[in-house]
Amino acid sequence: MSLKAGDSFPEGVTFSYIPWAEDASEITSCGIPINYNASKEFANKKVVLFALPGAFTPVCSANHVPEYIQKLPELRAKGVDQVAVLAYNDAYVMSAWGKANGVTGDDILFLSDPEAKFSKSIGWADEEGRTYRYVLVIDNGKIIYAAKEAAKNSLELSRADHVLKQL
């Protein structure tokens, strides 16, 4: 079941997440993963959740994530409360990737979709179990924009510039 504008964000969606901490800000520092209840956390916020095939991969690292970091002030100006990036990598890798990109605090959450469970449930994961490149904009629990890229290395519909035009 893929999601589309007008749908409710599903209930019971949990991701794995390591919250950023000042005392564990070095890339080699290790935090403790927690369950991040996305259904609850996204219920009363405007959220941009973008997914990609994997941390530290070429298109994701060179273009996708850096553009969201750069465009964060513009997204906030358009009323976005939370930006989150999602991949099948475990929470430790996602946490290190956030640190490698200089993201501190909860400006952008680096979330793990263990075994691509959520992405598979909406039909947006490949046969290898990697998340597709996609974006969901959720406003108070309702999907207002949903798009999946046509190919793994495509970066059009889910890029920050395109999402800004949808807000």
UniProtKB/Swiss-Prot annotation:
UniProt superkingdom: Eukaryota
GO CC annotations on file: mitochondrion; peroxisome
Domain Thioredoxin: 3-167
GO biological process terms held by the UniProt record: cell redox homeostasis; cellular response to oxidative stress; hydrogen peroxide catabolic process
InterPro entries attached to this UniProt entry: PRX5-like, Redoxin, Thioredoxin-like_sf, Thioredoxin_domain
Keywords: Allergen, Antioxidant, Disulfide bond, Oxidoreductase, Peroxidase, Redox-active center
Database matches in Gene3D superfamilies: Glutaredoxin
Residues annotated as transmembrane: none
The protein's enzyme class: oxidoreductase
Enzyme Commission code(s) on record: 1.11.1.24
Molecular-function GO terms, alphabetical: protein homodimerization activity; thioredoxin peroxidase activity
Keyword Disulfide bond: yes
Active-site residues, record numbering mapped to chain: C60
A Pfam family: Redoxin
Additional record remark: The active site is a conserved redox-active cysteine residue, the peroxidatic cysteine (C(P)), which makes the nucleophilic attack on the peroxide substrate. The peroxide oxidizes the C(P)-SH to cysteine sulfenic acid (C(P)-SOH), which then reacts with another cysteine residue, the resolving cysteine (C(R)), to form a disulfide bridge. The disulfide is subsequently reduced by an appropriate electron donor to complete the catalytic cycle. In this typical 2-Cys Prx, C(R) is provided by the other dimeric subunit to form an intersubunit disulfide.
Family designation: Belongs to the peroxiredoxin family. Prx5 subfamily.
Subunit structure, as described in the record: Homodimer; disulfide-linked, upon oxidation.
Name this polypeptide is given: Peroxiredoxin Pen c 3
Organism: Penicillium citrinum
